[in-house]
């Protein structure tokens, strides 16, 4: 092999290794930043396909705030509350100001890190902003586990429909 071909081969190999390393690092970063959505039941029992989150994994969890479960620390902005759907309850801990629409019995989505099998340390809490609106992930999960609500004509009339 002449020196010119060796040099060209070295350049091509260096470019190939550089591109491969870049793609590998991008895939690693995307995998680390992926937040999977769970309901409280899926978090405790696992998803139907068998996946279950590991302690330390970032995730999103959605459900209804259990009435009477909100506990506030009087000396800080720390709040903890329980979430449920149709199964087990999951405790959410959060430090910060909760959204104005946050209430017991209301639907929320929390984004955070799984601390143990039934505790999530949230760094973001989002409250439902409309009676009719529900995030697509929660709507899909609720559709699987709940019967649709049937409203009487008086109830529909009272809601302005």
Curated annotation (Swiss-Prot):
Gene3D superfamilies: Nucleic acid-binding proteins. It is a single-pass type II membrane protein. GO terms for biological process: cytochrome complex assembly. InterPro entries: CcmE (IPR004329), CcmE-like_sf (IPR036127), NA-bd_OB-fold (IPR012340). The chain crosses the membrane at residues 9-29. Residues 1-8 are cytoplasmic. Heme chaperone required for the biogenesis of c-type cytochromes. Transiently binds heme delivered by CcmC and transfers the heme to apo-cytochromes in a process facilitated by CcmF and CcmH. PANTHER family: CYTOCHROME C-TYPE BIOGENESIS PROTEIN CCME HOMOLOG, MITOCHONDRIAL. Belongs to the CcmE/CycJ family. HAMAP family: CcmE. This is Cytochrome c-type biogenesis protein CcmE. The lineage of its organism: Bacteria, Pseudomonadati, Pseudomonadota, Gammaproteobacteria, Vibrionales. The gene is ccmE.
